[in-house]
């Protein structure tokens, strides 16, 4: 495969990824048409012009809805799923020994940089080369502004402005859908028709929002703002999407600037309501609880609700008021007021029922999913399941709702149904680490160590930063006596979270097995500092204390473990410690209780007999 110019100015997000995917899809179609269909979501997102060749089977409903009903913005991690899907197609069709060369990577969109990292990690037989040098033509117009040749740029700047505009217009007329996120708006911005540029920028923003290309939304949105009259409807469309993307990327102060600018330039009540809502969510959704000012968030969301309540159009009022009430429900939830949160969501559902039949299905879907979470937390799992069923019915292509329903079914003991939900989530989504992780936990709970380990292996392949996968895999490896691999996972996990109590608990077991009692004790101490309510850590430290010649300390730790969770093995171990202290009758009491809990254990029966 020839070197690919990865400059985002060519085709925007996935400039490199689109070129690669075109080759992969062509190869997949030659081998087996069904193979390409398995990656329909990735093809739709990265190379939509090929969807007719690989029509696929998974189609979310948002593509069929009008603009004002497409309310969902994918999380930033969606692009990691897409990158892994492309990598898995490459694994299926790309021969070993191939080199992939991307140049102009210093100007690549973050989606391509992420993809290149995933390909480097997941394709061991393929060489991925990234360079900053440019293979673009040494002409500004012909290269779509990607050339790095200073002489070409000097010649371009020396052109008569009218000639420059005409050249940009001509080049824009030659471009099509492949360049709609990159070269097309770039040329139109510099051509003679500003209205066409605004239209092209909006089309690009709208598509990038739907796909979750948030960095591109910010770039394109800011360019659209610069070409639009402040306070105009076009300006607000760009402003709202730009601020939303900035918030999703964690750039909250920049998002706040956009919302403040909207408040200063608009007299439209709906704009003020939406700006107040967006400002409230910057606090309510902050990933660090310590950084959330929920009082300030409440003030802003109350303003949004107050304005939405008096909007004159009944349909707009029913939607926006319900939308704002759902936002306030999140703030109430963050403050532990679950009943108040539930009341707000139910009020929003009642408002949605006032909308015309079929209107705003995504809004209704979100409301039922949110009510399900609240009902489950409040101890109403059957009602929660009903709401999740309704959410899934609105759009069966949303994987997160299958995960939520699977978790709830597992909690209710419906293991087979939970497994089916996890596997459906896997089927309807690009590679989804959370779905494999949840299935791995289910398999671990069933005692299927090899199956669970395979799932956790895949989670770490998909996302090397998935901490809990290291925790669980390390525990499995320790149980399988693969101490070297378990220690490697502990080290990798502690690099992500140096004080993680679960990893220190596994480390304590590994050090105990190696005979380093001092290191084991230190590890268990750290684990208990972080998770004092975890019975297994107290039990393992109790065993260590007994083996270190401290039966009194062992009894204390084992007693604390039993206070947290009755367990036959822990009663047995405490009986052994009591016997070492000469407390025969107390030991026998523990053995009898152990036998009650596990009457078939031969070690317990033998100890009672002796």
Specify the residue positions occupied by each region the protein language model found.
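Flexible helix-coil transition and linker loops at the boundaries of alpha-helical arrays
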Residues: 188-191, 226-235, 264-272, 305-319, ...
């Amino acid at each position: 495969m020839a070197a690919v110019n990865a400059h985002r100015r060519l085709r925007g997000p996935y400039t490199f990824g689109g070129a690669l995917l075109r080759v992969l899809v062509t190869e997949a179609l030659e081998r087996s048409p069904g193979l390409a269909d398995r990656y329909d979501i990735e093809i739709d997102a990265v190379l939509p012009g090929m969807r007719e060749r690989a029509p696929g089977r998974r189609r979310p409903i948002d593509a069929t809805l009008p603009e004002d009903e497409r309310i969902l913005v994918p999380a930033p991690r969606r692009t990691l799923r897409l990158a892994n899907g492309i990598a898995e197609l490459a694994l299926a069709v790309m021969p070993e020994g191939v080199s992939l060369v991307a140049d102009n990577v210093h100007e690549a969109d973050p989606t391509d940089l992420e993809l290149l990292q995933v390909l480097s990690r997941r394709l061991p037989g393929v060489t991925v080369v990234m360079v900053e040098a440019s293979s673009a033509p040494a002409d500004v117009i012909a290269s779509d502004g990607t050339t790095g040749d200073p002489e070409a740029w000097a010649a371009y700047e020396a052109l008569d402005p009218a000639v420059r505009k005409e050249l940009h217009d001509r080049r824009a007329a030659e471009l099509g859908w492949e360049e709609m996120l990159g070269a097309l708006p770039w040329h139109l911005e510099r051509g003679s028709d500003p209205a066409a540029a605004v239209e092209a920028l909006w089309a690009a923003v709208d598509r990038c929002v739907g796909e979750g290309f948030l960095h591109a939304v910010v770039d394109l949105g800011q360019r659209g703002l610069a070409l639009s009259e402040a306070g105009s409807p076009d300006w607000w469309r760009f402003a709202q999407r730009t601020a939303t993307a900035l918030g999703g990327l964690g750039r909250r102060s920049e998002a706040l600037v956009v919302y403040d600018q909207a408040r200063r330039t608009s007299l439209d009540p709906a704009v003020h309501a939406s700006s107040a809502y967006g400002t409230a969510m910057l606090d309510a959704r902050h990933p660090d609880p310590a950084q959330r000012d929920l009082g300030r968030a409440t003030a802003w969301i109350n303003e949004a609700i107050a304005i939405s309540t008096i909007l004159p159009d009944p349909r707009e009022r029913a939607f926006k008021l319900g939308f704002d009430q759902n936002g306030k429900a999140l703030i109430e939830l963050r403050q532990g007021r679950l009943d108040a949160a539930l009341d707000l969501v139910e009020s929003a559902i009642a408002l949605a029922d006032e909308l015309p039949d079929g209107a705003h299905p995504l809004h209704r879907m979100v409301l039922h999913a949110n009510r399900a979470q609240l009902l489950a937390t409040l101890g109403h799992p059957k009602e929660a399941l009903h709401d999740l069923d309704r959410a899934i019915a609105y759009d069966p292509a949303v994987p997160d709702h299958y995960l939520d329903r699977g978790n709830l079914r597992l909690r209710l003991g419906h293991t087979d149904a939970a497994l089916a939900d996890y596997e459906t989530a896997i089927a309807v989504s690009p590679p989804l680490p959370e779905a494999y992780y949840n299935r791995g936990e289910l398999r671990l709970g069933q005692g299927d160590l090899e199956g669970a380990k395979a799932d956790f292996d895949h989670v770490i392949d998909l996302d090397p930063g998935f901490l809990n996968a290291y925790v669980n895999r390390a525990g499995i490896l320790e149980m399988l006596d693969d101490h070297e691999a378990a220690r490697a996972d502990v080290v990798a996990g502690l690099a992500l979270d140096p004080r993680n109590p679960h990893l220190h608990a596994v480390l304590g077991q590994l050090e105990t097995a190696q005979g380093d009692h001092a290191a084991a004790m230190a590890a268990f101490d750290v684990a208990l500092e972080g998770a004092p309510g975890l019975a297994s850590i107290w039990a393992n430290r109790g065993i260590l204390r007994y083996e270190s010649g401290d039966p009194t300390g062992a009894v204390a730790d084992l007693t604390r473990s039993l206070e947290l969770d009755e367990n036959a093995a822990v009663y047995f171990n405490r009986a052994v410690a009591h016997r070492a202290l000469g407390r025969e009758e107390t030991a026998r009491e523990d053995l009898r209780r152990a036998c009650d809990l596990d009457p078939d254990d031969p070690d317990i029966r033998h100890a009672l007999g002796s």
